[in-house]
Amino acid sequence: MRRRLWLGLAWLLLARAPDAAGTPSASRGPRSYPHLEGDVRWRRLFSSTHFFLRVDPGGRVQGTRWRHGQDSILEIRSVHVGVVVIKAVSSGFYVAMNRRGRLYGSRLYTVDCRFRERIEENGHNTYASQRWRRRGQPMFLALDRRGGPRPGGRTRRYHLSAHFLPVLVS
C-alpha cells in the first residue's frame, strides 16, 4: 500500500516536470476532429424573440410564430468544426448574409452561407457570419421583435435577438 502511494506521488511530481507532456512548453501534435465535420441535423431554430426562423419559397429570411410550418424546417450541416451551413428543406434556399449584414436566401452554396455556431452560457446558440465583420465585430443572424431579420451590423453576441434554440423536428 505504501509503495503504491509513493509511486503515485512520484508520478505526480514527474508529471509536473518542465518537459512533461501536458505542460505549455511541450509541443502538441495537430488536433483533428473529423467526427465533428459533415454532421447533418434537421431542426427548427426558435429565437428568443419567440419566432421560428424560416426561408419562404421566394428566398426571404424572416420569422414565423407558426411552429408547424414546413418552411421553418432547417437542415443544419457542419462543414468545419464550429462552422455550419443552414438550408431550408422545403424551399432549398441557403441562409446567407451579405457584406452589409442583410440576410437573404441563396439558391447556391457560397461562402456567404457559412456561420460560426456557438453555444452560449444560457444554452442558446448564436450564428455569426464566418466571412463578414463590421468594424472588427462579428455580424450575427438575428430576428427582431416583429420577426423581421435584424441587420447583422447591429447585433452582438449578448443580444437576445441573436439567441436561438434548436428544436427537434417531430
Curated annotation (Swiss-Prot):
GO CC, alphabetical: cell surface; cytoplasm; extracellular region; extracellular space; extrinsic component of postsynaptic density membrane; GABA-ergic synapse; glutamatergic synapse; Golgi apparatus
Subcellular location: Secreted
Protein name (database record): Fibroblast growth factor 22
Family from the record: Belongs to the heparin-binding growth factors family.
Keywords associated with the record: Growth factor, Secreted, Signal
Residues in the signal sequence: 1-22
Transmembrane segments: none
GO molecular function ontology, one term from the record: growth factor activity
Quaternary structure, from the entry: Interacts with FGFR1 and FGFR2. Interacts with FGFBP1.
GO terms under biological process: cell differentiation; fibroblast growth factor receptor signaling pathway; neurogenesis; positive regulation of cell population proliferation; positive regulation of MAPK cascade; regulation of cell migration; regulation of synapse maturation; trans-synaptic signaling
Function (record text): Plays a role in the fasting response, glucose homeostasis, lipolysis and lipogenesis. Can stimulate cell proliferation (in vitro). May be involved in hair development.
